[in-house]
């Protein structure tokens, strides 16, 4: 919010306070002032000049030779290149010796052989942002009204001696999104009165109700709608003082009627809209919800497609405006407009916010409706606008208004005790001082034995509970005046949640296993969003309404595609061995219009060498079993290893013979495998393995407790076994059968070799297991181990048809 220091003085007497002092005081009261801008930017020596003569430069077609009266004894000759310079105009002139922004000094000069004693200025050359200059003067010099005094200070007329405070408002302080709201705040800080705008409205005998009727079908979305007619307006520029105030507020002047609606917006915080009455197409206004797919061309010349929850202003059939967001081009006020219908309404903030978001269209009006406006100002604002249009546009304000009023403004009373205020703030403020503060805030109240019952004005929707009143007292008392004290009360130790602890375990283990953590974008393209999903999902991924690019337009449903991008990027730069993991969220679509369900996943990608420089050993290439071993170690750390199984699977984008689902207690929670050769070809990578699983489901499983035991006093015995089985036999399933058959003496089973080669029969493979036998109470005899081992051999022969390799 940009606040003009001079404009603010119309509502609060602060002439004894500098703009910088005011900024410091406002900041200390709880509203941050992000900066104070001096509008003149060091400019001096610019006056109003009257063009007495203007003729073409004899040596240059695009230059004009002008004789200009600048209020001195003799007029001066100035060469000007502006296309809109002409005899009789009053223009800003930088005299010789003047200083313009950037410390640019004006000197006597010769342009194509002709002397030039000064410079005729455009507003941009005086330091005004080009975005705030009206279209009429965007490409030329500025022209003052004909009654401007020759030789007068041009900066004074342009209000460039003003200073502007930029307020960094938090969402709860929407009451300060207008000049009156800021005035109430400043008046409370300094204990002064607020001078409300005087409305001098002269109405004709004709009635607004003779020209228009109003009905509201969507009463919940639009509880209050007021309309008023102003006839016979003459479209032209708004008065100079209004234009300069709007520019100081960051709004570009357009015309008197439009500027007046914007001026009221900045003064009251009440959005208004002006319709060209003669373009309405009927004598009725109907406020309703849009029809699905209904279209309207808005003031920014864009055709918008509406949805059934959008609120529109119609003429009974056709949409004229998107309520609270932007008007329609068909009923826009133009230079030919004669009769104006003014709209002042209270639209539900939630409706406006959703419409604005859907259409990707934000405006000054929508920003205020979203955060909440004061419904008690709706009538006053439209009356003031009509008075200004009558005065500055030559219009005739018709008697009365037409309205559809279903609004019930309930009085809010919030109570707080002086004891609570002092206890919370750590102060010793008397009840009478608190009463003075509430009076300065213009909060009516009654006090009964130290308890304040405060009637909260409608302009302050942020005051709802007693703590809000405590904050108000603290702000006005001054946070810098509150005594410094040490914290008191019971202190508790912070701790990590179970999920946080487990996530740290995951990161530590994977980094210890040689993987590097990556953090990738949560946004991806539409074609990648549904790749490599753990669970199939028929619903469309959640997309952004206004994506920066198609590559970042959808919320991801898997972590793998983004990790593969990172691997492909590295491999393309000769970094062939890459091992990455990511702990991040995926976003599962729910019902239409609802927020997606966010779920934590773990994913990893490995390619190239698993061991780069093994000491006195061979380099090891990443394969399925390397990646599976990493996951098995992770599950062991998390205490769920015995609950995890693997099942062969076929997944899109994955190698059909080297992919497995990760199953936890019968439920598929993830997958592991090698990329499909076609996918590897597209990414230009080789032998790349991936995995992804749901951490939510892993963390939710019952983890096995960790037990500690003394170091064994008795030796263990190891036996190896290599068996030939069919290729369909699952090593994991056989391992489980071996563990059960070995009984209590068999403490560990490890698969250490898998062989499928030329020496094997067709459809056969060799699995080699190492088995460790141990008893903590005694030394096992060879006969006991042989008995248990033979039992294992017999079992695998019977269950799997295994043959012992010799």
UniProtKB/Swiss-Prot annotation:
Residues 409-484 form the B5 domain. Mg(2+) binds at residues 462, 468, 471-472. Binds 2 magnesium ions per tetramer. GO terms for biological process: phenylalanyl-tRNA aminoacylation. PROSITE patterns: B5 (PS51483), FDX_ACB (PS51447), TRBD (PS50886). SUPFAM superfamilies: Anticodon-binding domain of PheRS, Class II aaRS and biotin synthetases, Nucleic acid-binding proteins, PheT/TilS domain, Putative DNA-binding domain. It is found in: Cytoplasm. The keyword Ribosomal protein does not apply. Its main location: cytoplasm. Keywords: Aminoacyl-tRNA synthetase, ATP-binding, Cytoplasm, Ligase, Magnesium, Metal-binding, Nucleotide-binding, Protein biosynthesis, RNA-binding, tRNA-binding. Its cofactor is Mg(2+). GO terms for cellular component: phenylalanine-tRNA ligase complex. It holds the Pfam family FDX-ACB. Its EC number is 6.1.1.20. Residues 712-805 form the FDX-ACB domain. GO terms for molecular function: ATP binding; catalytic activity, acting on a protein; magnesium ion binding; phenylalanine-tRNA ligase activity; transferase activity; tRNA binding. Belongs to the phenylalanyl-tRNA synthetase beta subunit family. Type 1 subfamily. This is Phenylalanine--tRNA ligase beta subunit.
């Amino acid at each position: 919010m940009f606040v003009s220091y001079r404009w603010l003085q119309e509502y609060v007497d602060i002439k004894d306070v500098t703009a910088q002092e005011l900024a410091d005081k406002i900041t200390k009261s709880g509203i941050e002032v992000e900066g104070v801008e001096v509008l003149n930017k060091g400019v001096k020596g610019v006056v109003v000049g009257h063009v007495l003569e203007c003729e073409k430069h004899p040596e240059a077609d695009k230059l004009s030779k002008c004789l200009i009266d600048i209020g001195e004894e003799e007029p001066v000759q100035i060469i000007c290149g502006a296309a809109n310079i002409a005899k009789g105009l009053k223009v800003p002139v930088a005299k010789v010796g003047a200083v313009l922004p950037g410390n640019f000094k004006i000197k006597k000069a010769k342009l194509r052989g002709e002397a030039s004693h000064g410079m005729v200025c455009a507003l941009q050359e005086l330091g005004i942002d080009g975005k705030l200059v009206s279209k009429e003067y965007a490409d030329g010099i500025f022209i003052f009204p004909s009654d401007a005094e020759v030789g007068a200070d041009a900066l004074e007329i342009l209000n460039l001696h003003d200073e502007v405070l930029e307020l960094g408002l938090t969402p709860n302080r929407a009451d300060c999104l207008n000049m009156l709201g800021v005035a109430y705040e400043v008046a409370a800080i300094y204990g002064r009165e607020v001078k409300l705008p005087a409305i001098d409205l002269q109405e004709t005998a004709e009635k607004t109700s003779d020209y228009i009727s109003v009905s509201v079908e969507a009463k919940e979305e639009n509880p209050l709608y007021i309309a008023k007619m102003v006839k016979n307006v003459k479209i032209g520029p708004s008065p100079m003082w209004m234009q300069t105030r709007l520019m100081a507020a960051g709004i570009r002047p357009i015309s008197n009627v439009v500027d007046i609606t914007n001026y009221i917006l900045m003064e009251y915080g009440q959005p208004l809209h002006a319709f060209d009455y003669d373009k309405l197409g009927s004598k009725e206004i109907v406020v309703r919800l849009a029809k699905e797919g209904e279209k309207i061309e808005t003031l920014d010349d864009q055709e918008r497609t509406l949805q059934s929850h959008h609120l529109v202003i119609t003429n009974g059939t056709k949409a004229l405006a998107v309520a609270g967001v932007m008007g329609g081009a068909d009923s826009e006020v133009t230079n030919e407009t004669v009769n104006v219908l003014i709209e002042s309404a209270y639209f539900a903030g939630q409706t406006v916010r959703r419409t604005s978001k859907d259409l990707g269209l934000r405006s000054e009006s929508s920003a205020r409706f979203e955060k909440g406006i004061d419904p008690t100002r709706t009538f006053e604002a439209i009356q003031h606008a009509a008075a200004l249009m009558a005065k500055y546009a030559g219009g005739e304000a018709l008697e009365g208004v037409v309205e559809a009023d279903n609004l019930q403004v309930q009085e809010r009373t919030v109570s707080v005790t002086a004891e609570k205020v002092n206890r919370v703030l750590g102060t010793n403020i008397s009840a009478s001082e608190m009463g003075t503060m509430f009076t300065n805030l213009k909060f009516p109240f009654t006090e009964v034995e130290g308890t304040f019952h405060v009637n909260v004005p409608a302009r302050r929707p942020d005051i709802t509970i007693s703590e809000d009143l405590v904050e108000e007292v603290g702000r006005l008392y001054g946070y810098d005046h509150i005594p410094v004290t040490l914290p008191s009360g019971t202190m508790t130790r912070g701790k990590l949640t179970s999920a946080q602890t487990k996530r740290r375990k995951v990161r530590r283990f994977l980094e210890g296993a040689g993987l590097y953590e990556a953090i990738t974008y949560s946004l991806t393209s539409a074609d990648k969003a549904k790749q490599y999903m753990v669970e199939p999902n028929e619903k469309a991924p959640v997309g952004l309404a206004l994506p920066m690019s198609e590559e970042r337009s959808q919320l991801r449903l898997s972590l793998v595609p983004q990790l593969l991008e990172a691997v492909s990027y590295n491999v393309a730069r000769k970094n062939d061995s890459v091992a990455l993991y990511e702990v991040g969220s995926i976003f599962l679509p729910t019902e239409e219009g609802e927020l997606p369900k966010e779920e934590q996943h773990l994913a990893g990608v490995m390619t190239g060498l698993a061991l780069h420089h093994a000491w006195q050993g061979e380099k090891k290439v990443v394969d399925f079993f390397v990646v599976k071993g990493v996951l098995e170690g992770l599950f062991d750390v998390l205490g769920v290893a015995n609950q995890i199984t693997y099942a062969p699977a076929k997944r899109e984008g994955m190698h059909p013979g080297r992919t497995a689902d990760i199953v936890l207690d019968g439920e598929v929670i993830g997958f592991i495998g090698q990329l499909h050769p076609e996918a590897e070809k597209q990414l230009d990578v080789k032998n790349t393995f991936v995995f992804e699983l749901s951490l939510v489901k892993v963390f939710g499983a019952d983890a096995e407790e960790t037990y500690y035991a003394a170091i064994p006093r008795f030796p263990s015995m190891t036996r190896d076994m290599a068996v030939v089985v069919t290729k369909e036999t699952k090593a994991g399933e056989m391992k489980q059968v071996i563990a059960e058959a070995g009984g209590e003496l068999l403490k560990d089973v490890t698969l250490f070799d898998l062989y499928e080669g030329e020496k094997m029969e067709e459809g056969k493979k060799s699995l080699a297991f190492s088995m460790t036998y141990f008893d903590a109470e005694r030394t096992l005899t060879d006969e006991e181990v042989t008995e248990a081992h033979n039992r294992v051999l017999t079992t695998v022969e019977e269950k799997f048809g295994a043959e012992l390799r010799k």
